[in-house]
């Protein structure tokens, strides 16, 4: 029963994060924040699943490492875009 509650809650949050990602396409920073929210929910789902099945949590640490690298790469693209174009509008991103 508790697993059903965890999975349904995390799926609702995942769908909410996807909706925020699709609806906030004006600024790159808001898109990056919604992507980080989605990654956080995926980490929560992975952590619950690994603890339920009594597996080791090393894979979740690798997942966190890759998600931090993804966040740093996104922020570096954001800084580069602001330096070259002066704003973070996603419509001007297609010019590159």
Swiss-Prot record:
Membrane topology: Multi-pass membrane protein
Ranges that cross the membrane: 2-22, 28-48, 62-82
Entry keyword set: Electron transport, Membrane, Mitochondrion, NAD, Respiratory chain, Translocase, Transmembrane, Transmembrane helix, Transport, Ubiquinone
Biological process, per Gene Ontology: ATP synthesis coupled electron transport
Coiled-coil blocks: none
Reactions that this protein is recorded to catalyse: a ubiquinone + NADH + 5 H(+)(in) = a ubiquinol + NAD(+) + 4 H(+)(out)
A single Gene Ontology CC term: NADH dehydrogenase complex
Chief subcellular location: mitochondrion
Pfam families for this protein: Oxidored_q2
Subcellular locations according to the entry: Mitochondrion membrane
Record EC number: 7.1.1.2
GO molecular function, one term: NADH dehydrogenase (ubiquinone) activity
Function: Core subunit of the mitochondrial membrane respiratory chain NADH dehydrogenase (Complex I) that is believed to belong to the minimal assembly required for catalysis. Complex I functions in the transfer of electrons from NADH to the respiratory chain. The immediate electron acceptor for the enzyme is believed to be ubiquinone.
Family listed: Belongs to the complex I subunit 4L family.
PANTHER family documented for this protein: NADH-UBIQUINONE OXIDOREDUCTASE CHAIN 4L, NADH-UBIQUINONE OXIDOREDUCTASE SUBUNIT ND4L
Protein name: NADH-ubiquinone oxidoreductase chain 4L
Organism: Drosophila nasuta F (Fruit fly)
Taxonomic classification: Eukaryota, Metazoa, Ecdysozoa, Arthropoda, Hexapoda
């Amino acid at each position: 029963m508790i697993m059903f509650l965890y999975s349904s809650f995390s799926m609702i949050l995942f769908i909410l994060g996807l909706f925020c990602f699709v609806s906030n396409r004006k600024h790159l920073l808001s898109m990056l924040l919604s992507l980080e929210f989605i990654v956080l929910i995926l980490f929560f789902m992975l952590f619950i699943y690994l603890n339920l099945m009594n597996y080791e949590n090393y894979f979740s640490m690798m997942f966190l490492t890759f998600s931090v690298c993804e966040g740093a790469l996104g922020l570096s693209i954001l800084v580069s875009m602001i330096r070259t174009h002066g704003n973070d509008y996603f419509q001007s991103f297609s010019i590159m």
